[in-house]
Design a protein with these regions (language model features):
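Sec-dependent N-terminal signal peptides of Gram-positive bacterial secreted proteins and lipoproteins
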Residues: 2-22
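A residue-level marker of the well-folded mature domains of exported/periplasmic proteins
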Residues: 20-22, 27-354
Length: 354
């Protein structure tokens, strides 16, 4: 008999609770600017620049582009960290423009209102909205990803590798479309593998402590409880939230982690894989098109929605990053090809969970 994924009651409890209803002056960095200022700027999302994930992956793409083209670059962090307001983001973006930026990369959906304000003020400056959407402005281009694909691969691979009790903690408190797609794909991947293996898998999914994408003692306590109650691997989807999951896993003998956004294998030997999206590559490509004079023809007021066909989603397969016991890279390539050619269809139509 075909077995289906069993999602624990905690999944629905979390949805009912959450889904249904000292800044420092010198917080910026980069290369030495010229008399004309910094050409390429990144205004970070909530959390730290070196978060091993979303901010860092975006910034690394901008750095790679700038360095290979001999351009100066700088990053700007909005005041108040994870509690940054739209006014804080506007101030950081204005600072980037005043510093001479000709193009500003703004990762994160929370940037939308500030980005629209500053882009309207500065029509001569170009803006790249990562994890965003078209804003109806010719000087803004947006990049989004099929996160459900990466989530699917992570859930599928974990179950195929023998894990039967999985968890996932997701940022955005149910309002972040990217995190929602990661979660939706993760559950679909687990379910597909459970059906293929004719087994039952239990999953506990939470958006409870991810509103600010930050590490917290509350999140660490929650994940510690999951591991204590038998959860074998937890998908840590939300910037610095990974640090809480790492701390909880370190208290266990065998607790494993799935990372997100970038290859997070270097963060901990407990990370068995990462639901990857090619942030650095897609940012680099977009900036290259701008430099080549293709903005008006290919980027102005456009949304680039990237996935397996663009090699923008998936799992990292480098030797040190692949830490499954029995599920092989060849098996992964087989299921990747089936998603790419449409043999396996992954639903992306998940509602806002707020």
């Amino acid at each position: 008999m075909k077995k289906l994924l069993s999602v624990l009651l905690a999944f629905f409890m979390v949805f009912a609770l959450v889904g249904c209803s000292n800044n420092e002056d010198d917080n910026n960095g980069g290369t030495t600017g010229t008399e004309d200022g910094y050409k390429v700027a990144v205004v970070t999302d909530v959390g730290q620049l070196n978060d091993g994930g979303f901010n860092q992956g975006t910034y690394e793409g901008a750095v790679a582009f700038a360095e290979k083209n001999g351009l100066s670059y700088k990053y700007y962090q909005p005041a108040n960290g994870s509690d940054a307001t739209d006014d804080d983001r506007i101030a950081a973006m204005r600072q980037a423009v005043e510093g001479g930026a000709e193009i500003v990369v703004t990762p994160g959906f929370l940037q939308a209102a500030a980005l629209e304000t500053v882009a309207k003020e500065n029509p001569e400056v170009k803006f790249v909205f990562v994890d965003g959407w078209a804003l109806g402005l010719d000087n803004v281009t947006a990049i989004s990803y099929h996160e459900e694909e990466s989530g699917f691969f992570a859930g599928y691979a974990a179950v195929m590798d023998g894990y039967t009790k999985l968890g996932g903690t997701f940022g955005g408190a149910g309002t972040n479309a990217a995190c929602n797609r990661f979660a939706y794909g993760y559950v679909q991947g687990m379910q597909a593998a459970a059906a293929e293996l004719d087994t039952t898998v239990e999953a506990t999914i939470s958006f409870l402590y991810g509103g600010s994408f930050s590490a917290s003692t509350e999140l660490q306590t929650q994940i510690s409880g999951w591991y204590t109650n038998g959860t074998e691997v937890v998908f840590a989807c939300g910037g610095s939230m990974l640090q809480s999951v790492k701390a909880a896993a370190a208290e266990t003998e065998n607790g494993k982690i799935i990372g997100v956004d970038t290859d997070q294998s270097a963060e901990s030997d407990r990370v068995i894989t990462s639901a990857f999206k090619n942030l650095s590559g897609s940012v680099d490509l977009t900036l290259t098109k701008w430099l080549e004079g293709k903005w008006d023809a290919e980027l102005a007021d456009q949304l680039s929605n990237l996935g397996v066909g663009d090699e923008a989603t998936g799992l990292p397969t480098a030797e040190g990053s692949w830490r499954f016991n029995s599920f092989t890279v060849d098996q992964y390539h087989e299921v990747f090809a089936k998603v790419a050619d449409g043999s396996i269809k992954i639903d992306s139509d998940c509602a806002d969970l707020s």
